Swiss-Prot record:
Quaternary context: Component of the small ribosomal subunit. Mature ribosomes consist of a small (40S) and a large (60S) subunit. The 40S subunit contains about 33 different proteins and 1 molecule of RNA (18S). The 60S subunit contains about 49 different proteins and 3 molecules of RNA (28S, 5.8S and 5S). Interacts with ribosomal protein S21.
UniProt-recorded name of the protein: Small ribosomal subunit protein uS2
Lineage: Eukaryota, Metazoa, Ecdysozoa, Arthropoda, Hexapoda
Pfam family, one: 40S_SA_C
GO cellular component, one term: cytosolic small ribosomal subunit
Localisation per UniProt entry: Cytoplasm
Family label: Belongs to the universal ribosomal protein uS2 family.
PROSITE patterns, per the entry: RIBOSOMAL_S2_1, RIBOSOMAL_S2_2
Highest taxon listed in the record's lineage: Eukaryota
Chief location bin: cytoplasm
Function text: Required for the assembly and/or stability of the 40S ribosomal subunit. Required for the processing of the 20S rRNA-precursor to mature 18S rRNA in a late step of the maturation of 40S ribosomal subunits.
Length: 290
Protein backbone atom coordinates (compact mmCIF):
# COMPACT_ATOMS: atom_id res chain seq x y z
CA UNK A 1 0.00 0.00 0.00
CA UNK A 2 2.92 2.35 0.66
CA UNK A 3 4.13 1.92 -2.94
CA UNK A 4 7.75 1.52 -1.80
CA UNK A 5 7.80 5.17 -0.73
CA UNK A 6 9.79 5.95 2.39
CA UNK A 7 7.39 8.64 3.51
CA UNK A 8 4.50 6.13 3.51
CA UNK A 9 6.45 3.21 4.97
CA UNK A 10 5.86 1.99 8.50
CA UNK A 11 8.51 3.53 10.78
CA UNK A 12 10.14 1.77 13.70
CA UNK A 13 8.94 4.53 16.02
CA UNK A 14 5.32 3.87 15.03
CA UNK A 15 5.80 0.13 15.52
CA UNK A 16 7.16 0.70 19.02
CA UNK A 17 4.17 2.89 19.84
CA UNK A 18 1.77 0.22 18.62
CA UNK A 19 3.51 -2.47 20.64
CA UNK A 20 3.53 -0.30 23.76
CA UNK A 21 -0.21 0.38 23.35
CA UNK A 22 -0.94 -3.35 22.73
CA UNK A 23 -2.43 -2.57 19.33
CA UNK A 24 -1.30 -5.97 18.05
CA UNK A 25 -3.16 -7.95 20.74
CA UNK A 26 -6.49 -9.30 19.52
CA UNK A 27 -9.10 -11.45 21.22
CA UNK A 28 -9.46 -15.17 21.75
CA UNK A 29 -12.09 -15.54 19.00
CA UNK A 30 -11.77 -14.68 15.31
CA UNK A 31 -14.40 -13.65 12.81
CA UNK A 32 -14.00 -15.51 9.53
CA UNK A 33 -13.70 -12.19 7.67
CA UNK A 34 -10.84 -11.08 9.96
CA UNK A 35 -8.71 -14.19 9.51
CA UNK A 36 -6.55 -12.53 6.85
CA UNK A 37 -5.43 -9.89 9.37
CA UNK A 38 -4.28 -12.38 12.02
CA UNK A 39 -0.56 -13.08 12.19
CA UNK A 40 -0.61 -16.05 14.59
CA UNK A 41 -2.18 -17.41 17.72
CA UNK A 42 -0.45 -17.48 21.10
CA UNK A 43 -0.50 -20.54 23.36
CA UNK A 44 -2.99 -18.83 25.67
CA UNK A 45 -5.46 -18.50 22.77
CA UNK A 46 -5.01 -14.78 22.07
CA UNK A 47 -4.63 -13.89 18.40
CA UNK A 48 -1.91 -11.48 17.25
CA UNK A 49 -2.76 -8.88 14.60
CA UNK A 50 -0.43 -8.25 11.68
CA UNK A 51 0.66 -4.62 12.11
CA UNK A 52 1.75 -4.45 8.46
CA UNK A 53 -1.85 -4.95 7.36
CA UNK A 54 -2.98 -2.47 9.99
CA UNK A 55 -0.71 0.21 8.54
CA UNK A 56 -1.87 -0.47 4.97
CA UNK A 57 -5.53 -0.11 5.90
CA UNK A 58 -4.74 3.01 7.94
CA UNK A 59 -3.17 4.69 4.90
CA UNK A 60 -6.13 3.69 2.72
CA UNK A 61 -8.56 5.18 5.24
CA UNK A 62 -6.50 8.39 5.47
CA UNK A 63 -6.62 8.78 1.68
CA UNK A 64 -10.39 8.38 1.68
CA UNK A 65 -10.79 10.98 4.42
CA UNK A 66 -8.44 13.45 2.74
CA UNK A 67 -10.35 13.12 -0.54
CA UNK A 68 -13.51 14.62 1.01
CA UNK A 69 -13.72 18.24 -0.10
CA UNK A 70 -15.48 19.51 3.03
CA UNK A 71 -13.99 18.00 6.22
CA UNK A 72 -17.19 18.67 8.16
CA UNK A 73 -18.97 15.98 6.13
CA UNK A 74 -16.74 13.33 7.76
CA UNK A 75 -18.38 12.00 10.94
CA UNK A 76 -16.31 10.41 13.74
CA UNK A 77 -18.45 8.32 16.09
CA UNK A 78 -17.72 6.53 19.35
CA UNK A 79 -20.35 5.33 21.79
CA UNK A 80 -17.71 3.69 23.98
CA UNK A 81 -16.36 5.78 26.81
CA UNK A 82 -12.75 4.90 26.00
CA UNK A 83 -12.97 6.39 22.52
CA UNK A 84 -14.95 9.57 23.13
CA UNK A 85 -11.95 11.74 24.00
CA UNK A 86 -10.04 10.44 20.97
CA UNK A 87 -13.00 11.18 18.69
CA UNK A 88 -13.27 14.74 19.96
CA UNK A 89 -9.55 15.35 19.48
CA UNK A 90 -9.60 13.81 16.01
CA UNK A 91 -12.50 16.03 14.99
CA UNK A 92 -10.77 19.09 16.43
CA UNK A 93 -7.56 18.66 14.42
CA UNK A 94 -9.10 17.34 11.20
CA UNK A 95 -12.20 19.60 11.28
CA UNK A 96 -14.52 16.60 11.20
CA UNK A 97 -17.89 16.31 12.96
CA UNK A 98 -17.78 14.31 16.21
CA UNK A 99 -20.57 12.25 17.76
CA UNK A 100 -19.31 11.18 21.19
CA UNK A 101 -21.69 9.23 23.37
CA UNK A 102 -25.11 7.84 22.56
CA UNK A 103 -26.07 7.93 18.90
CA UNK A 104 -29.61 9.15 18.22
CA UNK A 105 -31.44 6.49 16.18
CA UNK A 106 -32.68 7.82 12.88
CA UNK A 107 -30.08 10.60 12.65
CA UNK A 108 -29.15 9.42 9.14
CA UNK A 109 -32.54 8.15 7.94
CA UNK A 110 -35.31 10.18 9.61
CA UNK A 111 -35.48 13.60 7.97
CA UNK A 112 -38.16 14.88 10.35
CA UNK A 113 -36.11 14.90 13.55
CA UNK A 114 -33.84 17.87 14.33
CA UNK A 115 -30.74 15.66 14.66
CA UNK A 116 -30.90 14.59 11.01
CA UNK A 117 -27.48 14.61 9.29
CA UNK A 118 -26.19 13.68 5.85
CA UNK A 119 -22.51 12.73 6.14
CA UNK A 120 -20.40 11.59 3.22
CA UNK A 121 -18.10 9.35 5.26
CA UNK A 122 -18.43 7.59 8.60
CA UNK A 123 -15.63 6.54 10.99
CA UNK A 124 -16.54 4.36 13.98
CA UNK A 125 -14.45 3.11 16.87
CA UNK A 126 -15.97 -0.36 17.01
CA UNK A 127 -18.60 -1.76 14.60
CA UNK A 128 -19.89 -4.01 17.37
CA UNK A 129 -20.80 -1.23 19.81
CA UNK A 130 -21.54 1.33 17.08
CA UNK A 131 -23.84 -0.99 15.14
CA UNK A 132 -26.71 1.52 14.97
CA UNK A 133 -24.89 4.20 12.90
CA UNK A 134 -23.28 1.50 10.76
CA UNK A 135 -26.67 -0.01 9.97
CA UNK A 136 -28.24 3.36 9.16
CA UNK A 137 -25.27 4.24 6.96
CA UNK A 138 -25.99 1.15 4.87
CA UNK A 139 -29.55 2.41 4.23
CA UNK A 140 -28.37 5.70 2.73
CA UNK A 141 -25.19 4.43 1.02
CA UNK A 142 -22.64 6.08 3.32
CA UNK A 143 -19.18 4.44 3.26
CA UNK A 144 -17.96 3.27 6.67
CA UNK A 145 -14.42 3.10 8.07
CA UNK A 146 -14.14 1.08 11.27
CA UNK A 147 -11.44 0.02 13.74
CA UNK A 148 -12.00 -3.71 14.05
CA UNK A 149 -10.75 -6.34 16.44
CA UNK A 150 -10.34 -9.98 15.49
CA UNK A 151 -13.90 -10.76 16.63
CA UNK A 152 -15.58 -7.69 15.08
CA UNK A 153 -18.27 -8.22 12.40
CA UNK A 154 -17.47 -6.61 9.04
CA UNK A 155 -21.06 -6.35 7.83
CA UNK A 156 -21.64 -2.96 6.15
CA UNK A 157 -17.99 -1.99 6.81
CA UNK A 158 -16.12 -0.78 3.72
CA UNK A 159 -12.62 -0.27 5.19
CA UNK A 160 -11.63 -2.27 8.27
CA UNK A 161 -8.53 -1.20 10.22
CA UNK A 162 -7.44 -4.20 12.33
CA UNK A 163 -6.35 -3.23 15.84
CA UNK A 164 -7.08 -3.79 19.50
CA UNK A 165 -10.36 -1.99 20.23
CA UNK A 166 -10.53 -3.05 23.88
CA UNK A 167 -7.51 -1.10 25.10
CA UNK A 168 -7.93 2.64 25.81
CA UNK A 169 -4.33 3.31 24.77
CA UNK A 170 -4.72 1.39 21.53
CA UNK A 171 -7.88 3.28 20.59
CA UNK A 172 -6.28 6.65 21.32
CA UNK A 173 -3.13 5.78 19.39
CA UNK A 174 -5.03 4.62 16.30
CA UNK A 175 -7.09 7.81 16.18
CA UNK A 176 -3.87 9.81 16.60
CA UNK A 177 -2.16 7.96 13.75
CA UNK A 178 -5.19 8.41 11.50
CA UNK A 179 -5.34 12.15 12.25
CA UNK A 180 -1.62 12.51 11.56
CA UNK A 181 -1.81 10.77 8.19
CA UNK A 182 -4.84 12.83 7.16
CA UNK A 183 -3.04 16.07 8.01
CA UNK A 184 0.01 14.87 6.07
CA UNK A 185 -2.03 14.20 2.96
CA UNK A 186 -3.68 17.62 3.27
CA UNK A 187 -0.26 19.24 3.52
CA UNK A 188 -0.86 20.81 6.93
CA UNK A 189 2.01 19.11 8.77
CA UNK A 190 5.38 17.67 7.85
CA UNK A 191 6.62 14.14 8.43
CA UNK A 192 6.71 14.61 12.21
CA UNK A 193 3.79 15.79 14.31
CA UNK A 194 4.68 17.60 17.51
CA UNK A 195 1.40 16.62 19.18
CA UNK A 196 1.80 13.67 21.55
CA UNK A 197 -0.53 10.63 21.40
CA UNK A 198 -1.21 11.03 25.12
CA UNK A 199 -3.66 13.81 24.31
CA UNK A 200 -5.95 11.25 22.62
CA UNK A 201 -5.87 8.76 25.51
CA UNK A 202 -8.83 8.20 27.78
CA UNK A 203 -8.49 9.70 31.26
CA UNK A 204 -10.33 8.32 34.26
CA UNK A 205 -12.26 11.04 36.13
CA UNK A 206 -11.30 9.50 39.49
CA UNK A 207 -7.61 9.73 38.64
CA UNK A 208 -8.05 13.37 37.62
CA UNK A 209 -9.69 14.11 40.98
CA UNK A 210 -6.76 12.48 42.78
CA UNK A 211 -4.30 14.57 40.78
CA UNK A 212 -6.21 17.75 41.62
CA UNK A 213 -6.30 16.79 45.32
CA UNK A 214 -2.54 16.23 45.28
CA UNK A 215 -2.03 19.65 43.72
CA UNK A 216 -4.22 21.26 46.39
CA UNK A 217 -2.22 19.57 49.15
CA UNK A 218 1.03 20.84 47.66
CA UNK A 219 -0.36 24.36 47.23
CA UNK A 220 -0.20 25.45 50.96
CA UNK A 221 3.53 24.73 51.08
CA UNK A 222 4.05 27.07 48.18
CA UNK A 223 1.78 29.75 49.69
CA UNK A 224 3.88 29.95 52.87
CA UNK A 225 6.56 31.77 50.91
CA UNK A 226 4.16 34.63 50.25
CA UNK A 227 1.92 36.73 52.50
CA UNK A 228 -1.83 36.72 52.18
CA UNK A 229 -2.21 40.32 53.39
CA UNK A 230 -3.66 42.55 50.69
CA UNK A 231 -1.59 45.44 49.42
CA UNK A 232 -3.28 48.79 50.19
CA UNK A 233 -4.46 50.57 47.11
CA UNK A 234 -3.05 53.99 46.28
CA UNK A 235 -5.72 56.61 45.69
CA UNK A 236 -5.22 58.50 42.49
CA UNK A 237 -5.69 62.27 42.40
CA UNK A 238 -5.36 62.70 46.17
CA UNK A 239 -4.27 65.92 47.93
CA UNK A 240 -0.63 65.46 48.87
CA UNK A 241 -0.83 68.50 51.18
CA UNK A 242 -3.24 66.66 53.46
CA UNK A 243 -0.71 63.89 54.02
CA UNK A 244 1.99 66.39 55.10
CA UNK A 245 -0.36 68.32 57.41
CA UNK A 246 -0.01 66.04 60.49
CA UNK A 247 3.73 66.79 60.64
CA UNK A 248 3.10 70.51 61.41
CA UNK A 249 2.26 70.12 65.15
CA UNK A 250 5.43 68.14 65.75
CA UNK A 251 7.48 70.86 64.10
CA UNK A 252 5.72 73.53 66.17
CA UNK A 253 6.42 71.63 69.39
CA UNK A 254 10.09 71.31 68.48
CA UNK A 255 10.53 75.09 67.97
CA UNK A 256 7.90 76.86 70.11
CA UNK A 257 9.71 80.17 70.20
CA UNK A 258 9.75 80.59 66.44
CA UNK A 259 6.12 79.63 66.06
CA UNK A 260 5.05 81.95 68.85
CA UNK A 261 6.95 84.87 67.35
CA UNK A 262 5.45 84.36 63.94
CA UNK A 263 1.84 84.56 65.11
CA UNK A 264 1.91 88.17 66.45
CA UNK A 265 3.62 89.35 63.30
CA UNK A 266 0.79 87.95 61.17
CA UNK A 267 -1.78 89.60 63.45
CA UNK A 268 0.06 92.89 63.34
CA UNK A 269 0.19 92.72 59.56
CA UNK A 270 -3.56 92.23 59.45
CA UNK A 271 -4.11 95.14 61.84
CA UNK A 272 -1.80 97.37 59.83
CA UNK A 273 -3.80 96.68 56.69
CA UNK A 274 -7.00 97.56 58.49
CA UNK A 275 -5.46 100.78 59.88
CA UNK A 276 -4.19 101.75 56.47
CA UNK A 277 -7.64 101.35 55.01
CA UNK A 278 -9.21 103.43 57.72
CA UNK A 279 -6.50 106.13 57.39
CA UNK A 280 -7.03 106.32 53.66
CA UNK A 281 -10.74 106.74 54.19
CA UNK A 282 -10.27 109.53 56.72
CA UNK A 283 -7.71 111.25 54.51
CA UNK A 284 -10.17 111.18 51.67
CA UNK A 285 -12.74 112.72 53.91
CA UNK A 286 -10.28 115.40 54.96
CA UNK A 287 -9.45 116.10 51.36
CA UNK A 288 -13.09 116.38 50.52
CA UNK A 289 -13.39 118.95 53.29
CA UNK A 290 -11.06 121.31 51.56
Amino acid sequence: MSGNLDILALKDDDVNKMLAATTHVGSTSVNFQMESYVFKRRPDGVHIINLGRTWEKLLLAARCIASIEYPGEVFAISSRQFGQRAVLKFAHYTEATPIAGRFTPGAFTNQIQPAFREPRLLIVTDPLTDHQPVTEASYVNIPVIAFCNTDSPLKFVDIAIPCNTKSPHSIGLMWWLLAREVLKLRGKISDKWELKPDLFFYRDPEEQEKEQAALLEAAPAAKEMYTDEPIPAVEEGGNWGEEAAPAAPAAAAAVPAVAGAAIPQMIQADDWNEDETQTAGSWGGATGGF
